[in-house]
Structures are given as structure tokens and as C-alpha cells.
Amino acid sequence: AILDVVYNHTAKVDIFEDLEPNYYHFMDADGTPRTSFGGGRLGTTHHMTKRLLVDSIKYLVDTYKVDGFRFDMMGDHDAASVEEAYKAARTLNPNLIMLGEGWRTYAGDENMPTKAADQDWMKKTDTVAVFSDDIRNNLKSGYPNEGQPAFITGGKRDINTIFKNLIAQPTNFEADSPGDVIQYIAAHDNLTLFDRS
């Protein structure tokens, strides 16, 4: 089984702020926790926050013998922490699969640039894969044009772009291995594949 892990949707910022104020989240320069639509942005570059991520992944593999993880909003996390979690879990399961939503959503701490675990990271890793929104948008449409006609619903699309996506060469990011790219059309987000009227 592949588990869906959602480290970035904590609903309330207080969940971690009550443990240790101004630590577990990425912060603005004034000490305000950075948030997104799902709550606080978990500060995975902070030592104990990274440990929370890595240790919980290891625990799930060791205790429940899971085969892998799908990271919701993986692009919110730094690449080094996700890579460390993968390597730690792989010692327990050498066939571990790790993939995620590699959208370019990383906020980090203000004025502290760090490599995000997003689609742009795919040229640097062969251990973790990301979803290709390019193939989804061309075949059925998606954010930000959800519901607009696409290839399978009669919309005009460039067939060469679709073919490039089928061989793991999306047009919106570069990958150096086909295993870096998860081609998909529909998942738990957004509209269904197709609704008949």
C-alpha cells in the first residue's frame, strides 16, 4: 500500500505552535508562521521538524510495512528533508516508492533560499517522483482552467505535446529519467475525469 501523507495541512497553526512557538513552521522575518490554504507551512528545514517528518515516515514503514508514500503538496517541503526521509525508509524497505505533488509552492523561511521538493528538483533526484500536471491539463484540463475542453473532451491540443508527455517529457519541467514523472489524469483533487450531462 502507498499511504497519502499530508504534513502541510495542519488546519490550525496552534497544533505545533503550542508545542514550541515560532519553530515548527516556516516563518516570516517578523516571526509570523507562514500559512497556506491547509494551515501552517511545516518548516522542514528546521532540525526537529525534519526529524518529525523522517521519523514518522520510518515508523509507518517499520510498523505498518507500507510500500511507499504519496506526499500531498510535496513542493511545500525542502528537497533535502524529503530525500532524507526516502533514504531512511529505504533501509527498512529497499523497494520503497515515494512520489508527490511537486507543485512550485515552496515558501520556506523568509530570506533563506532552499531547494524545494518540486518539479524543478527532478533533474537532481532519481529517488522521488512527481505528478505531471502538464499531461493532466492537456488530456482533461485542470488548475487553473478546470472544466475547460481538453483532448479527451473535444478540446484542441497539440498532439506532439501529448506524445512528449507520454514518454515522460512534460513541457513545464525537465526530468532526467522517466521514473521521475507520474503521468496521471485524475486524482483526489479537482473535478472528475468526465461527467456526462
Where are these regions (language model features)?
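Short, solvent-exposed loop/turn and secondary-structure capping segments
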Residues: K12-D18, D109-N111, F194-S197
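Active-site-proximal helices and loops of the catalytic beta/alpha 8
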Residues: K65, M73-D176, V181
